[in-house]
Amino acid sequence: MRKFIFYVFLISLLIVSCSQDKKGYDALEKGLIGILEKKDEGYILQQLEKSAEQKNEDVFALAYVYLGTQGEEFYNKFLKKSNGYAEYYKAMFLKETNGMEDEIINLLESSAKQGNNKAYYMLGSIYESKFEFSKAQEYLKKGKDAGEIYSVYSYNYNKNLADVYSRIEELNKKLKDDTINQVEKKELGTLIVEKVSNYEEGYNILKDFLSENYPPALYAKAKILELEDKEEEAIQIYNEIFMKNKYYLAGFELASKLVKTSKNYELAMKVLDDTNSDEPVISGYKGFVYENMKQYKKAEENYLKAVEKNDIGIMIYLGSLYENLGETKKAKDIYTKAYHLGSVDAGYKLSYLLEELEENKIKDSKNNKKDNAKKDSKDDVKKSKEAKKILENLVKNGDDYSMVDLSLYYPQGDPNIRILNLKAAAKLNKTAFYNLGVFYYEKKNKEKAKFYLKVAKENGYDIGTVFERYIRN
């Protein structure tokens, strides 16, 4: 599907493996508890600084969440002393507060030189936003070569659109030099809307063509209206350009709204068919609609059309279809392909599938034995070495959900469970709060167990009836 740059990545750290240095987590935890209990700011900062002084890198994620746009002084204390994390988060702070771009770039380059490979992804994103894709790819390749998964994804995505992006660069230079003609201007705006999904920039270029009812210009206007919570006005525009021009992106918007609001799959499919488009966004969504209509062969055919054009997002849908149809090998193969192209979601899916296969193998092995051994507490620990390796990579790339999942690969009471869930809790992951509650419950630490379980519940996690009673007593 079309590419969107989500700033959720801004607080995704490149975290070191949990088997490495564990210093600073006691202070980090005190700081975390202080934040959740709304303790004095001086006490909280003291704990965060102590953790950072002990070379703990996760604390910078917590500081970023807690301090927000007030964190510059904190980051300044640890410049050149934190393997690039202070520089990284100061750059994020400046980005949030509209700081000077040159300073942001210098900080990120310094961060990368100190070993924080996540900075390469952010540098690539900055140049992508300026339509300087060649420069972006230089940074993303460095991140990719270092194994930074978001760089891997973006590099492969951009590589798939190399010709388009080269043309955008060429035309954008003409726009800046004021040597672009109207035909080229229309082409540039259209490419930015359709291939980059940057509606504001695309609209700024295409608004001169609104008077001629140019579909991409009207579409960009409608997308901006939606961002302004003017959905009815946007839908009117989608209807207009679909009825008059069968514009494929308008058709996609209308079809997706039909599915979301009324589950009218038949009408949605008619709209998609009427676009007469073979763009991945259309064929991929057709696959989704056919799957919901239980026409699985047609779903597969349309998913494959998008996958053949290297649409990484649709690979996940195709893998899920194969899983639901019991075609495990096909599911594993497509998830593996998407994961190697940088998809975090594919990594999740693949790890879950590998674990399920491992559990089934163990179950079959036990069933074939005459005498089943008494169940051991270690039986609850997840077993797949392949799945664990994938999750370790996702943790290394700063994904908090993988931190939580990886903690399930350690036996009850293992200190790695605490460390992994503290990493995720530093990003306010509610499952991590619950897991910490259970960890301390098993350690007979009633105070901390109740504290984390209450926090998990307050953040919407279902802690179950047993722990509901426990925290009340």
Q: What positions do the PLM features span?
A:
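Position-specific recognition of the canonical hydrophobic site in helix A of tetratricopeptide repeat
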Residues: I35, K95, E128, N160, ...
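Hydrophobic/aromatic packing residues within the alpha-helices of TPR/SEL1-like helical repeat arrays
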Residues: L48, Y75, L108, L140, ...
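Single-residue signature of alpha-solenoid repeat helices
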Residues: I44, G71, I104, A136, ...
